[in-house]
Design a protein with these regions (language model features):
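Gram-negative outer-membrane assembly/targeting C-terminal domains
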Residues: 305, 312-343
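Bacterial Sec-dependent N-terminal signal peptides
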Residues: 1-31
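Short N-terminal edge-element motif at the start of the domain
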Residues: 107-157
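Short aromatic loop motif centered on NTY/YTY
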Residues: 135-144, 148-157, 171, 192-309, ...
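Beta-propeller blade signature
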Residues: 105-116, 179-188, 293-311
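Beta-propeller fold detector
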Residues: 119-128, 192-201, 316-322
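Start-of-domain marker
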Residues: 20-91, 95
Length: 343
């Protein structure tokens, strides 16, 4: 009986402590909702920045709470929170919509330090406008290619983990972009953005033969909407089978003629593969003369491409058979809501 009472008291203490921790996190969450709503609705850029700074402070307060990695923050509207399945990485991102229709990008990461057995948090500093050839660079938290992330995908190569992020970045009044970013986390929780895990040698948008991309940046018109998400879809793979040439004798009306021979043509085999993959619209210019003028790039109607995780890389497959319904959640078509995307 005494043992039962003691266990009940211990359980009550832990429940009370958990409730207190959650009440603190609830208060931080409510404040973030209020500040972010005010930031988006404000017509004063200085006030927008001040409110964003307050949001940053609250996010850091959340990450400092023990076991906050498990706390549900899906109620946040303007601050997107993505958490890896292994609960070792979390990223917060939001956008400051300035009055001149440009954007500021803010982010904070929470990652696990294996040595100290605790989480560490880092502020991300956007340098996207100053980075030349950003697609080919590994970047640090102080040189972040800022974006609003709306999807996280976890993959592995041996013991090395990759967190692939799908995101949005507004570039100008006429050009926006969708991004496929790759994050790696070191043993001490240090964050690196960008990694060469893309097999896109036949991807015309990035130039055939491309082997150096560490992130993919898809630029297109603000008047269009590009679908980019992680879906369960079908790929039809074609391959030529190598077979030994057989020789068929043909009749000759003249004796002494060598028998003519004709090799068999290579047979094309196809197989359907159904799996989760990154699914995306194909972007094309309105005319060949508009190549590389991204304000004239739009999704091609009814042509869907994909990136499938194969042999530790995201391998490009063109024109997939996208018969399965695509995800309607995660705002994959237009991730920034509430008039944050330029019309």
């Amino acid at each position: 009986m005494k043992k039962y009472i003691l266990l009940s008291i211990i359980a009550l203490i832990f429940t009370k402590a958990y409730s207190q921790d959650n009440s603190i996190l609830d208060a931080y969450k409510d404040s973030i909702i209020n500040y972010s709503t005010a930031m988006v609705n404000s017509n004063n850029d200085k006030i927008k920045i001040e409110l964003s700074d307050k949001i940053s402070g609250l996010v850091f307060q959340i990450t400092e709470q023990e076991k906050s990695i498990n706390y549900d923050l899906s109620e946040l509207k303007f601050v997107k929170v993505l958490t890896s399945k292994d609960k070792k990485f979390r990223v917060f991102t939001w956008v400051i919509p300035f009055t001149d229709r440009t954007y500021g990008y803010r982010g904070i990461t929470q990652s696990y330090n294996q040595y100290k057995k605790e989480f560490v948090s880092y502020k991300l500093t956007d340098k996207g406008d100053k980075l030349g050839f950003a697609q080919n660079k590994s970047l640090s938290i102080k040189k972040w290619y800022g974006a609003y992330y709306y999807k996280i995908i976890e993959t592995k190569r041996g013991s090395k983990k990759f967190y692939t992020l799908l995101g949005w970045r507004g570039i100008s009044r006429t050009v926006q972009s969708k991004i496929i970013e790759v994050v790696t986390v070191k043993s001490k929780g240090n964050i690196t953005f960008g990694y060469n895990i893309f097999d896109i040698r036949n991807y015309e948008y990035f130039g055939k033969g491309n082997r150096s991309s560490k992130r993919l940046i898809f630029k297109f018109s603000t008047q269009g909407n590009m679908y980019l998400n992680y879906d369960y879809q079908t790929i039809v793979i074609a391959s030529k089978s190598k077979s030994k040439s057989s020789y068929k004798k043909k009749k000759s009306y003249k004796s002494g003629f060598n028998a003519q021979s004709s090799p068999d043509k290579a047979k094309v085999k196809t197989k359907s593969l159904k799996d989760n993959m990154i699914v995306l619209d194909r972007l094309v210019p309105t005319s060949p003369q508009m190549k590389d003028f991204y304000e004239f790039y739009y999704p091609e109607s009814n042509i869907i491409d994909a990136l499938l995780w194969q042999k530790s890389k995201w391998k490009y497959y063109p024109d997939i058979d996208a018969r399965n319904k695509t995800n309607s959640n995660d705002n994959a078509k237009k991730p920034i809501e509430y008039n944050l995307v330029p019309k």
